[in-house]
Amino acid sequence: MATAWSTDERKFMHRALMAAERGRGRVSPNPLVGCVLVKEGQVIAEGWHDHLGGLHAEQMAIHDAETNGFSPNGATAYVTLEPCNHFGRTPPCTEALMWAGIKEVIVAHPDPNPTVRGAGIEVLEKAGIHAVSYTHLTLPTIYSV
């Protein structure tokens, strides 16, 4: 668990939060989730959970990167909610992140779903992906960029 947001982490997570807002009104009862992929200090893609049954934020960001000619391999993912690690309407986001070669995942908030809480981070770490969770910080901390 990390102790404080760096300036860049706050900036990228703020952008992920803004991306998450794009799903408002279309994903209930699921939460709003945003993801930004960053490589060499530059945003290469973003995604959000757009509608029920559609791509999750991480999956959309990976697709966005590839569609725009960027390889997500070696990127850092800034995700507003812990990546899911179970099959539902879509495959697990943890698998998508591993498949894409993401090197690090920064998570703003653990998933409140007891099926997922902590398991997504654990799976990523076991796969050799550096996963950082700011579980003790509140989301308003990110908004004050």
Region roles according to the model:
Residues 2-6:
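Secretory/periplasmic and organellar redox-cofactor proteins
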Residues 9-26:
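Short, basic/aromatic recognition patches
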Residues 16, 34, 41:
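Conserved hydrophobic/aromatic pocket- or pore-lining residues that grip, position, or stack substrates
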Residues 29-32:
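Short, small/polar residue-rich loop motifs at catalytic or cofactor-binding pockets
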Residues 37-134:
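Zn2+-dependent cytidine deaminase-like catalytic core
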Residues 136-145:
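Single conserved hydrophobic/aromatic residue that forms the stacking wall/gate
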